[in-house]
């Protein structure tokens, strides 16, 4: 990083130099330099940083880094800064100390995503899980359910993506990443790929389902789907994104919210049902929360995998904890979903 800052170059040029100078790969120095030239961006400064890094690595100036072991202090719940926050933290105190750090961050995420009522909803769901938690491994069932429940409740819909893109501190971070001077102008181009399903997720459930089933409406909405490149530093695009971000206040009445929370309810129900008869199975089902991730096609694939597991469990089959663990492992290891489908059918 110091070499990159010294030369005003991107970090990848320094990393390539260190990699080339170490000799761990069977490629010549010239082949690495050719790649930097091919990129065609700030070639001179990046080549200089590459050369400096190469020289240091090839002369034995790079040694194995042994990070110092730093003991993290025990987590303490911060002081509330508002009456609404104080009410939430008081509710958090009803949970075991081993759970509070994860649940606190979940609360923080829910408030940022929606509002304080949403954070209360998060704790209410977990209170039912805690009542069935036998306490093993420092209430691991409650902790892991809380970890993935927060992520799922804060699913990335169009308002959430727009909220991220228009945060006040974001332009400063972009300026820092591209090494732009404080008085230097730059453009920011964002890549969006909205799907018909994501547009319909903003509508009330009845209307959204109607539009999804209508071929005429689908043809019209397809005009707004596909890859889009938008300059978010322009006034019109920024204001449009701010408008979309503001739609989150109506999120509870949207099709997407209803759809996601119906699936969340099924997952939590499966976890609670298993907790009373097979705690290990309950833990594995709670860990299945990590399957649901991403946006667009990735989101559709991962949620379908979660639902496939829940359907098998809900069918009353005698599913073992190890079986669920294997299914989850296959789903996480293969983005195509083929390995998961084969394991599920076995």
Predicted features and spans:
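Metallocofactor- and cofactor-centric catalytic cores in central/energy metabolism, strongly enriched
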Residues: 38
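Active-site loops and adjacent core secondary-structure elements that bind or stabilize anionic groups
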Residues: 34, 43-346
